[in-house]
A protein has these predicted regions:
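A detector for small-residue-rich transmembrane helices and their helix-helix packing motifs
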Residues: 1-194
Length: 194
């Protein structure tokens, strides 16, 4: 049973629901469309956890990783949970929960460093930095075993993961760099844990 994968998906879903529907400052106006589909970054949790170069420099270093717990919009959370379930299950079936969690966190951390201090991103959210890290680990495991079918993940799910991987590179320059740096972090984590 993929303990890390399921637990992480549950955590990001709860944070998404709380931040989008419940813990919004009374001074903020959030439309029903923003709550249900488009998303917003006006909630208390988002303000406390999103990636911010300025706030990291002031000592709020948790933001290098905590931003991976946040999502803006229904499509964002659905696509990231789906990808996490697929690649997380595949990697966790080979490495176990602890190493998979460390690969995810390490990838998110490396991407956070890159995006905050090299790219100078002023605000960032999303688990995709860690997911792309797990995708890198998945690729390394596939190369090591000689096949992408090294895990119990069905072929259809691997196709969905491939679409997610390619599609995630086409949504914008900043997002592409988040994904590239997360993938690079995953390669480093893979060299450590595989």
């Amino acid at each position: 049973m993929p303990i890390f994968t399921i637990t992480f998906c549950a955590i990001i879903l709860v944070i998404y629901l709380l931040d989008n529907f419940i813990v919004i400052p009374k001074t903020e106006t959030v439309t029903l469309k923003e709550k249900l589909w488009a998303g917003h970054n006006k909630g208390y949790i988002n303000h406390a956890l999103h990636l911010s170069e300025k706030k990291i420099k002031k000592g709020q270093v948790w933001r290098l990783v905590s931003s991976s717990l946040l999502h803006i919009g229904t499509w964002h959370i659905i696509s990231n949970i789906t990808a996490t379930l697929i690649v997380g299950y595949a990697v966790e079936s080979q490495l176990g929960a602890v190493k998979t969690a460390l690969c995810f966190i390490g990838s998110a951390f490396i991407s956070g460093l890159w995006m905050a201090f090299v790219y100078k991103l002023h605000e960032g959210e999303g688990a995709s930095t860690g997911i792309y890290g797990l995708i890198a680990v998945f690729v390394m495991l596939a190369v090591k075993s000689g096949t992408v079918f090294f895990s119990p993940v069905p072929t259809a799910a691997l196709i969905v993961l491939a679409v997610y991987t390619v599609g995630g590179m086409l949504v914008g320059k900043a997002t592409a760099w988040e994904h590239i740096s997360g993938f690079a972090g995953g390669l480093l984590m893979g060299f450590i844990f595989i």
